[in-house]
Every structure is written in structure tokens, then in C-alpha cells.
């Protein structure tokens, strides 16, 4: 069945898979090598602008690859209608399906956030493993910049998620109900819990970071009030109407697991949207305080509270886990279809895995990635790239004539 499905998918996107994908992949790899190995010669020649341009080209190629592969991914979820005419439409129409652009927006913001928090992780590791004062100051600054990027790009992330789900509902409300109120409702609960935790952790880092900035204490009273709002908003965001796997109570389930009627409004989308808006707004205000403090006061880099680097590492891990989890939710939303209502999954694995099983697989993958990344950073510190020392000229005795 999987062989037939892959054959069908490749036949639907022949130009993309046979020409577009390999070309973009090879070009991106080549430009990446140029970017890495051109730094030293361009730096010596004082031509850093060329290196920046190379970096821009590298990002454009990477984004092009991302957008291109979003086509088949969304085609599997929202194939163009009418479905009986699917074999008569062109490849571009299959790529530019209903969910293609919303997923592009969501992944673009998600990958930008991921990039910022990966800088945080690298800066935090290097800070914790550095002995020299100058190195700790530098990597403290790296963590600060990474958090600045990660938080700034993360702010519109909930809005991108709403745009994507709205398009799903417009295409087929059955998919949306399956995600929000049916078998994947508890998956979304975990997603809400993690997003709320990430917003809280980002604000905690800004708080800890501002304690080493002169005259930043003037913002602390407002930030303390903001933390109260963040906790309330995050709690509302991941509060479900019931803890059943489906919309209806199942046999053997305790009816006390349903919110009382006087609190049922907490599970409505009006409350969720208000909570999300509050989370984003408070984080944005704290972000402004953070930026003003760094511009108007002296930052004592290298003297951050020890909690700071560990918060950055947590943010990086949580972001990777969240990206993997959202991919799981999107894939499972097709239910027992390889391509929704076009190509049915008839394999024994067509069932939706449990929350525990999905969490185990996602966590295993994320831990593997994180351990490998940690090992790469550790090797870079343990065995740094050193330049060969130039041989000093030595005096050679001359024979007297």
C-alpha cells in the first residue's frame, strides 16, 4: 500500500520531485559550504558584505525548499476540489492547494523561532562551558541576541496557527472538528500547555536578564503584574471542556472530568482567543521594556543569573518538541487516509496512536536530535579549529670564506 501511495505521490508531482527538489537541495548544500569556508578569506579582505549576501542567498534557497515541499504535504491534507477531477489538473494547482500558503506562513514563523532558539542553546552551552571572562561575556551576548530573535518571531506564531486551522475548517470542517474536539483534542491540549510554558519561560529569561542591566528595575513592578496575567492566560488556553478523547463521554469515563457549567466558558474559543491575545500582548510589552532597558542602561554581560542559560536551553528543547508535535497533529488529522478522501490507508498501522505512544516517539526523536547537537557543540569546544603556527626563521651558521 505504501509503495502504491509513493508511486501516486511522485506521479502527481513529477517536476517537483525529479527536478525542483534535487536542484534546490544541491544548490543549498553548495552555497552552505561557500558560506562556511569563505568567512576567513572575506574577513581578512574586509569584504563582509559579500558574506552577508551569501547568507541571504542561502536562506532564500532554504525557504524555497521548505515552501516547495509544503506543496505535497498540504496536498495530502487538502487536495483540490472537485476530487473526481484531480487527475486532470496541473502540478501547480496541486501545490497551490487551500492549506499551502497558511502552512507556509506557519512554518516560516516556526522556523524563524527555531533559528533564534538554536542560537540561544548554542550561546547557553558555550557560556556554561567557558572558563575565560571574555568568552562568558561574548556567549552571554549571543544568548541575549538569540532570545531577542526567538521572542520577536514567536509573537505572531499563534496568529499563524489560527490562519492555518481556519483554512482547514473552510476546506472541510470534519478535519477541524477532529483536531479541536475529537481524537486530537488532547494533542491540542498538550500543544497549548507547551506554548503557554514557552511564553512563560521567554518572559522569565527577560526578567532574569534585566537584573544585570542598570536602571532596569523601574520596569519590574509592571513586569510582575504581567507575570500574573501570563499565568492566568496560559491556564485558560490549555483548559479543556472535558478530558474525553472524543466530544461525547465514553463508557467508563468519570463524568466529573467535565468542567462545571459555570466554568464552561473557559473552554470556548472566545476565551482561548482572549487568553492568546493576552499572552502575546504581555510578552510584547515585556519585550519593549527589555529593549528599552538594553538601550538606556549598561548591560553587565557575563554576570547573568545562572538560571538564564538553563531557561534558554529549555526554550530550545521545547521549541523542537513543539514543532515535532504539531507535525504529528497535522499528519494524524488525515485520519485513515494517505491523501484525504482520495487515497485510503488500508495498512494495519492506519489507526491513530495514543497520546502516550505519540509522545514517546516525538520525545525519542527530539532527544536524539538534542544529544547529537550537544555532542557537536562539545566537540567544537573540546577540539577547536586551530591554525598552524608559522615557523619562526632561525639563524643558520655560515661557513667563513
Model-predicted segments: where are they?
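Hard-cation-handling environments
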Residues: 184-243, 270-275
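Long, contiguous internal "core" modules enriched in hydrophobic/ aromatic residues
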Residues: 41-89, 94-192
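C-terminal amphipathic "assembly/sorting" segment characterized by alternating charged
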Residues: 263-401
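Hydrophobic alpha-helical membrane-insertion segments
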Residues: 55-76, 148-162, 224-242, 309-330
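Membrane-interface helix-loop-helix modules in multi-pass inner-membrane proteins
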Residues: 1-55, 161-176, 243-255, 259-261, ...
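Short aromatic-rich membrane-water interface segments that cap or initiate transmembrane helices
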Residues: 8-23, 88-110, 177-192, 258-276, ...
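Hydrophobic alpha-helical transmembrane segments
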Residues: 24-32, 111-119, 194-201, 277-286, ...
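Juxtamembrane membrane-water interface segments of multi-pass membrane proteins
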Residues: 1-6, 34-51, 119-147, 163-172, ...
Amino acid at each position: 500500500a505504501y509503495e502504491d501511495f509513493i508511486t501516486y505521490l511522485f506521479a502527481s508531482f513529477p517536476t517537483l520531485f525529479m527536478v525542483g527538489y534535487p536542484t534546490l537541495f544541491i544548490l543549498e548544500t553548495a552555497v552552505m559550504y561557500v558560506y562556511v569556508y569563505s568567512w576567513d578569506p572575506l574577513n581578512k579582505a574586509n569584504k563582509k558584505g559579500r558574506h552577508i549576501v551569501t547568507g541571504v542567498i542561502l536562506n532564500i534557497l532554504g525557504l524555497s525548499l521548505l515552501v516547495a515541499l509544503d506543496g505535497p504535504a498540504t496536498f495530502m491534507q487538502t487536495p483540490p476540489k472537485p476530487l473526481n477531477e484531480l487527475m486532470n489538473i496541473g502540478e501547480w494547482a496541486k501545490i497551490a492547494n487551500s492549506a499551502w500558503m497558511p502552512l507556509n506562513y506557519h512554518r516560516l514563523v516556526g522556523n524563524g523561532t527555531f533559528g533564534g532558539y538554536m542560537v540561544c542553546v548554542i550561546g547557553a552551552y558555550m557560556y556554561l562551558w567557558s572558563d575565560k571572562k571574555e568568552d562568558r561575556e561574548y556567549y552571554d551576548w549571543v544568548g541575549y541576541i538569540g532570545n531577542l530573535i526567538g521572542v520577536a518571531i514567536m509573537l505572531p506564531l499563534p496568529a499563524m496557527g489560527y490562519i492555518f486551522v481556519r483554512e482547514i475548517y473552510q476546506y472541510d470542517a470534519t478535519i477541524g472538528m477532529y483536531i479541536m474536539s475529537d481524537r486530537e483534542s488532547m494533542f491540542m491540549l498538550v500543544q497549548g500547555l507547551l506554548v503557554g510554558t514557552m511564553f512563560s519561560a521567554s518572559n522569565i529569561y527577560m526578567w532574569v536578564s534585566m537584573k544585570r542591566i542598570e536602571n532596569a528595575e523601574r520596569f519590574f513592578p509592571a513586569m510582575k503584574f504581567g507575570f500574573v496575567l501570563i499565568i492566568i492566560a496560559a491556564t485558560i488556553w490549555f483548559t479543556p471542556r472535558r478530558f474525553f478523547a472524543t466530544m461525547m463521554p465514553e463508557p467508563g469515563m468519570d463524568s466529573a472530568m467535565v468542567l462545571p457549567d459555570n466554568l464552561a466558558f473557559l473552554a470556548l474559543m472566545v476565551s482561548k482567543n482572549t487568553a492568546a491575545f493576552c499572552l502575546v500582548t504581555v510578552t510584547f510589552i515585556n519585550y519593549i521594556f527589555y529593549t528599552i532597558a538594553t538601550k538606556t542602561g549598561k548591560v553587565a554581560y557575563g554576570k547573568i543569573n545562572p538560571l538564564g542559560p538553563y531557561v534558554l536551553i529549555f526554550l530550545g528543547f521545547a521549541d523542537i518538541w513543539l514543532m515535532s508535535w504539531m507535525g504529528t497533529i497535522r499528519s494524524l488529522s488525515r485520519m485513515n487516509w494517505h491523501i484525504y478522501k482520495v487515497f485510503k490507508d488500508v495498512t494495519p498501522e492506519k489507526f491513530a496512536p495514543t497520546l502516550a505512544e505519540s509522545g514517546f516517539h516525538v520525545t525519542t526523536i527530539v532527544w536524539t536530535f538534542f544529544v547529537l547537537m550537544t555532542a557537536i557543540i562539545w566537540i567544537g569546544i573540546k577540539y577547536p579549529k586551530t591554525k598552524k603556527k608559522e615557523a619562526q626563521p632561525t639563524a643558520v651558521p655560515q661557513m667563513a670564506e
